């Protein structure tokens, strides 16, 4: 048997695993960092296999497999290859046809995986067909050796050794899919033993004999929801890379999934790309291939990896792009355009999912836009310069040219003004919209735009003049006031050599900066240097005000990543507190406040349901894909079981946009009341209680503070993630 979908039990236990990992790291921070430092001097030779100078473009079978369990057959892969050839997309660079998990049926006389004879009767003929279409063929496998090959104890090709001779003793799991104990099904290889590398060479030689051009090595640890060294596939990754070099065939190697950044030097040295996230597909968790929260996860994770990508050190793989099959993709057209813009900006491989025979007109227009696709081939991955409701990414191409992405992370329409000083220059002599192919500049001082919900702009900007860095003051977390379980821990890569962990899961478990001083009241930029593996969020408060949300992600508890958000500060001393009542935030290194108080103020305000006033049976609870990693549940079924936002503040009386991010499986209703007025019924539908879905309605508010309540006296209401209030445009 081969793994197909990720074992749901592993995902269900992810949060408890992270909590355990967190405690281990705080008590012994050198356990993994020492290994990281030993490896930091390793030379990068990810390109020794002759590929990987630029991210590839292609298609993968996995997304379609998640909604059609019988999809993975030779006949269907042949059809997809023919569809790619007929689509015209190869002229735009799409070349790879990648077969994911489930193709293998047994093992040959030398313990090497061979195809299922029923579903893949002639894989060499299939690969020849793919090559005949002018494409490249990819295949999936995993580290270690599976039980049938171990039980057969087959001889290793060209050696005197047998499969059992190369296994780690005592027997233990050889990848993230392996069971605990000494009967793991997926057995670990000991690469210090003779015959081990030769076995890997023989497997890759078999793939090469079929004509394979790409290998996805899945379940690699540290990573893949297993962040310790109990499995440790670093030696496997090195062995696969060496085997590819020995084969003499140019074969791209991608390792997967959610890799541990503490061992980045190994991943950079031996692989062309590494998956930095969980799967983008819902895999039964929603009714579509993917949805916006899964895309947003990539925006959260990427800042921690943004300095790790490039032509000689491999690429950050954000997983499949399901953007060309219409409604089954689970994304609006604006979301699809934003997703492709983001993948391109950060130079991630662009791997289409879904069924290539069903590409719709909008999807085909997206993936055949050569100006947008060229952004992904610059070899200069973009970096985030602004986080929050509007995110900005920029890639400096040299000679005054920049690729710039501006993203609206909310479902409301918003207006944004981006000062060019944020990007390091004063003015723009030319601005080109890469989606519309139109010149929209010059633009002095900055760029203003209106963005649809989850919409974006992808720009080529030619800047002139130098913008001097704004004055900045740093504040170390270990020097701030620690509350509750917050604790200082060693962190050699952190500013000052220390960090603060133990935050969250209680309102008192926080770190408070009491001495944040500015000369003038206004909007500043706050850089937050934090560390996490996977998704975590801060709920922070300025001067005792309402909670504000900073959603983060990453791949290390030892390597700080920076993200910057706008923050309003009063003249003089301010207090900023970081924590979260219902979830774990990232560990915190420091914050830095910069600017002169004149940064453009965000147009919208977010209010988290889990920290609103919860009545009756309503509870605030952890929710992995929700804003702030929390939501309010058990709403309705009684008049008292409601959520009340009592601090919704707007500058003037009028009609505003109200975004409601909810979670439900099936039809449920809210009864919403504004300022104690008559209730409005909102009938909502959804397919999951894990991934929030937005709806946007107009709402009349008066100047100052307003109250908005959600409940259902006679029936159950959806769970509630947050609301967003924004002006109407």
Outline where the language-model segments fall.
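Conserved structural scaffold segments of CAZyme catalytic domains across common CAZy folds
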Residues: 42-136, 144, 347-385, 401, ...
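Structural recognition of the beta-strand scaffold that forms the well-ordered cores
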Residues: 55-61, 93-100, 136-141, 213-218, ...
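Aromatic-lined carbohydrate-binding/catalytic grooves of carbohydrate-active enzymes
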Residues: 65, 80, 84-227
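Aromatic-lined carbohydrate-recognition surfaces of secreted/lumenal glycan-active proteins
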Residues: 136-150, 241-262
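Glycan-recognition surfaces
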Residues: 172-178, 192, 246-355
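Carbohydrate-binding surface patches
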Residues: 337, 343-346, 351-353, 386-425, ...
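Glycan-recognition and catalytic regions of carbohydrate-active enzymes
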Residues: 347-410, 492-504, 512, 572, ...
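Extracytoplasmic
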Residues: 414, 423-428, 451, 455-729
